[in-house]
């Protein structure tokens, strides 16, 4: 479910706090896990508005930010190597794999510093079973939404007003929501797992 989309000219803890407070005022009582890229101020805002929320770095964005600075011929191999980090069975195994990859790829002038800097925000990820992790690092639904917005922008490069842009985004959002009909496999098992890690906070119908 999409709770909202926002058009802003800045990112800060104050800005994100206003968004999160709006969610709270609309009735969103709790957030179990916040998965996001390096949006400035978001982690601080979450800690202030929803202090019990577990914050995680978005694996998809970590991968993309790493591949962005790599030559095309090396991308496929590096993408495969990065799986050794986020599919590791334990945190210590992921760290060990990261150190090995750093040594391997430093010879090709590829930096994995982004992963080291975000390791604390990736750490909670490893306590979940592989099927639950896959839900977290697979961003198909979000990507389909972003692609829809990109097509909107490509078809009309200039919007006369902010309201015109908001209208276009709203219609695009409604169109993509209608296509979201499938459910996650073994959702009941995943909810049961979350209920163990977040007791009395998961509502299972």
Where is each model-derived feature located?
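Conserved beta-strand -> loop -> alpha-helix junction used to position metal-binding or nucleic-acid-contacting
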Residues: 33-40, 45-81
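RNase H-like nuclease fold core
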Residues: 1-36, 40, 44, 48-52, ...
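Acidic/histidine-rich catalytic cores and adjacent linkers
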Residues: 84, 88-205
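Hydrophobic/aromatic-lined pockets within catalytic cores
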Residues: 24, 28, 47-51, 67, ...
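Flexible interhelical turns and helix-capping residues at alpha-helix boundaries
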Residues: 24-27, 35, 71, 105, ...
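A generic hydrophobic-helix recognition signal that picks specific residues
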Residues: 30, 54, 133-137
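Generic alpha-helical segment signature
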Residues: 9-13, 35, 71, 75, ...
């Amino acid at each position: 479910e999409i709770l909202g989309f926002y058009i802003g000219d800045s990112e800060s803890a104050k800005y994100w706090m206003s968004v999160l407070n709006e969610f709270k005022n609309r009735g969103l009582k709790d957030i179990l896990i916040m998965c996001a890229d390096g949006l400035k101020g978001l982690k601080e805002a979450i800690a202030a508005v929803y202090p019990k929320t577990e914050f995680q770095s978005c694996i998809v964005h970590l991968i993309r930010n790493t591949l962005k600075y790599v030559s095309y011929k090396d991308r496929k191999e590096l993408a495969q190597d990065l799986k050794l980090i986020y599919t590791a069975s334990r945190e210590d195994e992921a760290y060990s794999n990261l150190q090995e990859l750093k040594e391997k790829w430093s010879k090709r002038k590829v930096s994995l510093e982004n992963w080291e800097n975000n390791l604390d925000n990736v750490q909670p990820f490893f306590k979940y079973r592989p099927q639950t992790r896959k839900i977290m690092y697979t961003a198909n639904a979000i990507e389909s939404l972003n692609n829809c917005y990109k097509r909107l922008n490509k078809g009309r490069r200039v919007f006369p007003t902010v309201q015109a842009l908001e209208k276009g985004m709203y219609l695009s959002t409604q169109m993509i929501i209608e296509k979201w009909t499938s459910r996650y496999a073994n959702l009941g098992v995943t909810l049961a797992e979350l209920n163990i890690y977040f007791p009395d906070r998961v509502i299972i119908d």
